Amino acid sequence: MHKYDVVVVGGGHAGCEAAAAAARLGTNTLLITHKISTIGEMSCNPAIGGVAKGVVVREVDALDGIMGRAIDRASIHSVILNSSRGAAVWGPRAQADRKLYKQAIQEIILNYNNLTVKEESVDDFLIESNNNGELCIKAVITSSGEHILTGKVVLTTGTFLQGVIHIGEQTTPSGRMGDKPAVELANTLNKYDFRLGRLRTGTPPRLDRGTINWSILQEQVGDNPPVPFSYLTEKINQPQVSCFITHTNENTHKIIRENLHRSASSYLSDVVAPRYCPSIEVKVKKFAEKSSHQIFLEPEGLDDDTVYPNGISNSLPIEVQREMIKSIKGLENAEILRPGYAVEYDYIDPRELFHTLETKKVKGLYFAGQINGTTGYEEAAGQGIIAGINAALSAFEKKESFVLHRTDSYIGVMIDDLVTKGVIEPYRLFTSRAEYRLAIRSDNADRRLTQKGYDISLVSHERYSVLQNKLESIKQLEEKLGSLTITPEQLRSYGIKISYDGIRKTALDLLSYPNIDWNKLQEIWPELSSVTRWNDKMGHTKADNRAKNEICEAVEIEAKYKPYLIRQEADMKFLREEINTQIPIDFNYSQVKGLSSEVIEKLQTIKPATIGIAKQIQGITPAAIVSILVYLRNRKTKVAANFV
């Protein structure tokens, strides 16, 4: 009978990060998956990252996770979303060669120290009570009846838990096209009274590249040079390709409307789908006034003829999907290689978890990924690494756990949202969910988290050394900029007008002004030109060379955000102090500027009595709470003024 310190069930994005993290910490770890050949499979879109999501990938990488390095080896179209806006909303995103990404993940996982991979399915657990009457994991039981002893299990079932695929009226028990669902495991969770719910998601049809008329479509070129995700990647080496844009039209919508009754969404109305990644059926129904919807045609690989039409996820019958596709510009002759479909699956109420992602009902059992009601590769990876870390620390019987907080990471925001608010629809990360988003950006994940990982022996010496070199270089540059001064009068000769107070400003002070950048500083102090080129090597590795290019950017971003961070902290202090503020029962939320229709709808329906209660409602962001508080305070001030 085999025994392992940690057993991870599931080889998707959550499972791979959990297994790698547990193994990095030195535990004897087993990863059990249905098929070794599907480890690292990108089940839906062939891309990693995005707004908020890209920050999570950087955070996972800062903790020595594997997703960032894998996508850097597979990236064929890279962009920084929102690059024209502030760094707090930058969203690194990379289109992947699907085969290369899976190959990269498998090469990493199958050669990882302390990690064994087994092709099998888990149907049950052996759970016993300890001396304190607590239920504890003792073993996993496979479909072949084998008992594998362990005290720590991380369950990452994705969409496989009682999974059912829908294509029109046709239904097939499956967690992913071509893969069996996990039925017995769902029964096991029911047996131990876990609160299970049902969610669904979907995917679009895949198209044949050679049957698309690319010449009449709008080309979308990626960034040049492409920016890597991992702090250990010097540069992207894969050839870069373009994506293309087309649109649905009135005829497309007519075809969809006439067949809505045949879509899975018509008979799965009680199973909630992702609000922020809706199917084309939902778009046509919900936004009836729109004459078109955008579609991104994304290549799935350099030597792959498959194209992913991002924006038309659906569960219509195959013949309707064909008719719909041929109504779209550029796709008149397009052939479908695989139809789109919806998949429904079980999830557990994440409020049954601690912030470590250990279950409250069974000691030693952890959940990560879509089983917790989330959607997205990145959200899964972020949960997986935290669950794997805590399972390993607990296996060593260490008293401390590893918990990230809302103040230090998007992973912390996500997990706190899940375990305190729960979910009523597939959860997706957004910058609006993070009250400290000005501080937890994509550019500083290593400076926020790598030290935390190193302190528990999770992070390699190589990564830690790169960080230390980077921090020292940032410090040196800030000191240099702090030593260069100029008066407001002198600045006017360079066309810069600031407060005429006679006080000398340092170069670092000037960087905080929105209209002053590195180019302007070099004009004032030409000696800074040599600094920005960084001709001297910063360290001893290629990763050091990557990091040195980020030094000037890091210093400028920190300078620009400093006054806003002070204001952000003041807002959060205001929020903490006003948590018991009462909200009138007849309060009209639509009068509050900046609230989304989703937030207004939920608050008008629930009618929370206090700010504290409103804050706990799923989907209500900290920014929304601050806006309501400011409105209430201003209204109170106006009322008081009328009595003066």
From Swiss-Prot:
InterPro entries to which the protein is assigned, alphabetical: FAD/NAD-bd_sf (IPR036188), GIDA_C_N (IPR049312), MnmG (IPR004416), MnmG-rel (IPR002218), MnmG-rel_CS (IPR020595), MnmG_C (IPR026904), MnmG_C_subdom (IPR047001), MnmG_C_subdom_sf (IPR044920)
Residue numbers binding NAD(+): 273-287
Keyword entries, A-Z: Cytoplasm, FAD, Flavoprotein, NAD, tRNA processing
S-S bridge residues: none
Gene3D superfamilies cross-referenced by the UniProt entry: FAD/NAD(P)-binding domain (3.50.50.60), GidA associated domain, C-terminal subdomain (1.10.150.570), tRNA uridine 5-carboxymethylaminomethyl modification enzyme MnmG/GidA (1.10.10.1800)
GO molecular function: flavin adenine dinucleotide binding
GO biological process: tRNA methylation; tRNA wobble uridine modification
A GO CC annotation given for this chain: cytosol
Principal location: cytoplasm
Cellular localisation: Cytoplasm
Binding, FAD: 10-15
Cofactor list: FAD
Domain of life according to the entry: Bacteria
Pfam families with a match to the protein in the record: GIDA (PF01134), GIDA_C_1st (PF21680), SAM_GIDA_C (PF13932)
Function of the protein: NAD-binding protein involved in the addition of a carboxymethylaminomethyl (cmnm) group at the wobble position (U34) of certain tRNAs, forming tRNA-cmnm(5)s(2)U34.
Quaternary state and interactors: Homodimer. Heterotetramer of two MnmE and two MnmG subunits.
Family, similarity comment: Belongs to the MnmG family.
Protein name stated in the entry: tRNA uridine 5-carboxymethylaminomethyl modification enzyme MnmG
Organism: Wolbachia sp. subsp. Drosophila simulans (strain wRi)
